[in-house]
């Protein structure tokens, strides 16, 4: 009877262990599952500031990264990280209307100058990762290839035209060459090529839903193109538009760690 009791107890212990192991593995994505994720840092910053009483707390979603991955097997996946930044600002400034002032020196009539700034940046990382672990917390390692593109362009629009009668019109912005005004300022487009390795861990707090942390090393090379400025000026009473090359193309390389400041590279992932 004692031996039967011990056998039954051992069998029950083994059953509970298998049940626990099965329930843990049920939290993980399986081969053929697709995942989408986003950075957790902005949300954790917001919650942290809310609990410590920071005034003017707001959710800052700028500079966010989207994550996508597809599981080839239960323990391996291909992945894609996409970061898009597109910024445009329009500045309007009042200036004296030169034509009205010529007709009436006491005129206070104003018109507008406008400066339009555009910045675009794109970064794509494609890679492969392998997972290892039998409980809800499991680690991973992998490698990435990276491609990035960026450009900057500033355009100007003026209320007072540059003419033979008004070769030095009133303009809102300074810092321009004598007798000339910018129409465009364009920095050379930049291309980034990189290869890297990464490691990290994920915790599945719900089936197919996890929070993860990742850090890595990236070797990258940046190639910058020709920059130029477009200006308007008067030459011997003739209106002339000049294209001036201001930056020669360049090339640089670097070695970077992929771990931002606040919480590290934390992210949420949802699989289906």
Label the model's feature ranges.
Residues 23-32, 74-75, 133-139, 205-211:
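Short loop/turn motifs that connect adjacent beta-strands in outer-membrane beta-barrel proteins
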Residues 4-8:
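Sec/Tat signal peptide C-region and signal peptidase I cleavage site
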Residues 34-44, 80-86, 141-149, 201, ...:
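Transmembrane beta-barrel strands of outer-membrane/channel proteins
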């Amino acid at each position: 009877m004692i031996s039967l009791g011990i056998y039954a107890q051992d069998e029950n212990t083994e059953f509970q262990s298998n049940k626990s192991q099965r329930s843990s593995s049920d939290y993980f994505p399986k081969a053929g599952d697709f995942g989408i994720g986003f950075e957790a840092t902005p949300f954790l910053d917001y919650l942290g500031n809310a609990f410590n009483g920071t005034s003017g707390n707001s959710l800052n979603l700028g500079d966010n990264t989207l994550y996508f991955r597809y599981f080839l097997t239960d323990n391996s996946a291909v992945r894609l990280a996409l970061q898009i930044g597109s910024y445009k600002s329009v500045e309007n400034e009042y200036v004296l209307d030169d034509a009205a002032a010529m007709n009436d020196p006491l005129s206070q009539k104003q018109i507008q100058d406008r400066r339009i700034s555009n910045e675009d940046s794109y970064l794509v990382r494609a890679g492969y990762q392998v997972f290892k672990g039998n409980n809800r917390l499991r680690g991973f390692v992998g490698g990435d290839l990276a491609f990035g593109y960026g450009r900057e362009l500033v355009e100007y629009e003026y209320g007072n035209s540059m003419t033979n009668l008004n070769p030095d019109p009133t303009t809102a912005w300074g810092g321009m060459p004598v007798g000339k005004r910018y129409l465009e300022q364009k920095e050379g487009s930049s291309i980034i090529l990189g290869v890297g390795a990464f490691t990290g861990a994920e915790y599945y707090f719900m089936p197919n839903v996890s929070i993860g942390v990742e850090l890595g090393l990236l070797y990258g090379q940046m190639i910058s193109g020709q920059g130029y400025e477009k200006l308007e000026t008067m030459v011997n009473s003739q209106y002339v538009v000049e294209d001036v090359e201001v930056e020669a193309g360049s090339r640089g390389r670097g070695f970077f760690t992929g771990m931002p400041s606040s919480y590290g590279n934390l992210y949420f992932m949802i699989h289906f």
